[in-house]
Amino acid sequence: MEFLVSIEVGWPADGDPEELARLTAAERVRGAELGAAGTIRRMWRVPGRRANWGIWEAEDATALHAAIGSLPFYPYLDVEVIPLAAHPNDPERPGGR
């Protein structure tokens, strides 16, 4: 199942810079793992914000929640999830258009 996921990091202004650096490095590693596993399919940054939009794939909403919850920044994330359904005119879909 595919999901459109919006993530914004709400790091506190007075947060520890060393902890921020540690979490940033760990987040890159975990993000790469989720990408290699096919969970994160596509991702875009939002210019000027510490935010992104992505296409994620998981068996169901519970599996998606577990994947998002595995991100090191999870306690600081504002996440919005929109489940997606196939569209018959999707040009990337077999038989689409």
Where are these regions (language model features)?
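Conserved, structured core segments of small domains
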Residues: 1-97
